[in-house]
């Protein structure tokens, strides 16, 4: 845990004005971005660099945060079997709920049939519109994905900001530190000291979140327009409702069984959720989410393994989107899918979805990878949803974030690495001291 200053500097402050809370600032920025993008679309599209710059700032610090959290967490473990046990339980959880999300997407698409009645001729679709996504999808093979987890060089993993490569090295380095015993203690102590300024840097960067959210939202509305979603509103509405029900019912049941409320958890991570809403990237909230989960009572070793891994293997929102969108395309182009076709789609999606990263557009590329293997559904049909994918990206990212927060608490509980008193305090709204949440350190 990060050391908290004591003495006069840590004296309790008075009530913080509501406008100094990060979630209020991000919410206002999102609203302002929507208005500017709607009334001044040309100006809105020119603000894209603001959102891109903020995402790059956060990505800059993700690799050090993961390395420090994972390496110090594992180095503190005396039982190396525990590392494998935590990873194994996390993967079982990921596989179970990712598959469930895919199945729910299939069921909802068959019941609601959002694409029925559109009667689109597949031959009339422009394959060039999705050619770039399809090309990237073909590059994303299972073998290539697995081999890419191993970095060519340590420096390359950090320079590229590849989450899985950094995680892979961090786990090995943490195990090595634990195995050398007292000889590794100076290195471990140094990493613990280094954690404080790195996490303080994240706190500083998070203060720019409203600017990033404003620019990203202004660009989205300015480029695509609110009216562009009207024709495909049923698909968007179906997806949002399905994701909401998945969070409240499925994840809600998991949360209740494990001793906490899903609504309380959502309230606890509201700043991170609003940040994701503004940027369409769950990756933007990764450092702050890791800190929040640790402050909520989950041991650092569990947080460091579960959350970064979950960003590639536990994407519930992306999974719902994939099967729902695939069946929408089939329905819109009047292509009937038999039960065997849908089972094949499910099996392929189970594999292809495991390589999706928490960045904007990754879900669309993963969908292209899935459809390229399923012959019944034309990849060119993705042109139907290309214009609205950005509006669905927010929901995917939000659902993914909540899913990984739930997974972290559940795995920590399974491993008896959960401080239930801290969890109860966090869920009840008791202030939790953290270096990463700006509302506890208001701007001057």
UniProtKB/Swiss-Prot annotation:
Entry's transmembrane regions: 21-41, 57-77, 92-112, 161-181, 201-221, 234-254, 320-340, 345-365, 368-388
Keyword Transmembrane helix assigned: yes
Gene Ontology cellular component terms for the protein in this record: plasma membrane
Gene3D superfamilies (UniProt xref): Sodium:dicarboxylate symporter (1.10.3860.10)
Organism domain of life: Bacteria
HAMAP family the record matches: C4_dicarb_transport
Protein name from the UniProt record: C4-dicarboxylate transport protein
Organism: Brucella anthropi (strain ATCC 49188 / DSM 6882 / CCUG 24695 / JCM 21032 / LMG 3331 / NBRC 15819 / NCTC 12168 / Alc 37)
Gene that specifies this protein: dctA
């Amino acid at each position: 845990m990060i050391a908290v200053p004591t003495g006069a500097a840590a004296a309790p402050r008075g009530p913080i004005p509501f406008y100094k809370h990060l979630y209020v600032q991000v919410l206002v920025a999102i609203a302002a971005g929507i208005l500017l993008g709607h009334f001044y679309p040309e100006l809105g599209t020119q603000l894209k660099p603001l959102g891109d710059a903020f995402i790059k700032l956060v990505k800059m610090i993700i690799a050090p945060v993961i390395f420090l959290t994972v390496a110090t967490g594992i180095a503190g473990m005396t039982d190396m079997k525990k590392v494998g046990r935590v990873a194994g339980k996390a993967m079982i959880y990921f596989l179970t709920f990712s598959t469930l999300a895919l199945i729910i997407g299939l069921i909802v698409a068959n019941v609601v049939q959002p694409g029925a009645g559109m009667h689109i001729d597949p031959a009339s679709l422009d394959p060039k519109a999705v050619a770039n996504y399809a090309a990237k999808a073909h590059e994303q093979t299972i073998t290539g994905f697995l081999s890419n987890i191993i970095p060519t060089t340590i420096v390359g993993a950090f320079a590229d900001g590849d989450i899985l490569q950094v995680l892979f090295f961090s786990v090995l380095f943490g195990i090595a530190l634990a195995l050398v015993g007292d000889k590794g203690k100076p290195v471990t102590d140094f990493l613990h000291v280094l954690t404080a300024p790195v996490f303080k840097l994240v706190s500083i960067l998070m203060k720019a979140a409203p600017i990033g959210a404003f620019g990203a939202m202004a660009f989205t509305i300015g480029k695509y327009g609110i009216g562009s979603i009207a024709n495909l509103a049923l698909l968007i509405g179906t997806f949002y409702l399905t994701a909401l029900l998945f969070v409240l019912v499925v994840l809600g049941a998991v949360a209740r069984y494990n001793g906490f409320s899903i609504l309380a958890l959502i309230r606890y991570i509201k700043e991170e959720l609003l940040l994701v809403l503004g940027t369409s990237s769950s990756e933007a909230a990764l450092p702050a989410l890791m800190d929040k989960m640790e402050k909520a009572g989950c041991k650092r070793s569990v947080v460091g393994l579960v959350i970064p891994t979950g960003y590639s293997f536990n994407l519930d929102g992306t999974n719902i989107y994939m099967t729902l969108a695939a069946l929408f395309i089939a329905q819109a182009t009047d292509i009937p899918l038999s039960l065997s076709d849908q089972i094949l789609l499910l099996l392929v999606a189970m594999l292809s979805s495991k390589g999706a990263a928490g960045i904007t557009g990754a879900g669309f590329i993963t969908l292209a990878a899935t459809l390229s293997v399923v012959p019944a559904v034309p990849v060119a049909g993705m042109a139907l949803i290309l214009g609205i994918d950005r509006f669905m990206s927010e929901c995917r990212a939000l659902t993914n974030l909540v899913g990984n927060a739930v997974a972290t608490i559940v795995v920590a509980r399974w491993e008896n690495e959960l401080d239930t008193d801290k969890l109860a305090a966090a869920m009840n709204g008791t202030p939790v001291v953290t270096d990463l949440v700006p509302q506890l350190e208001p701007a001057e």
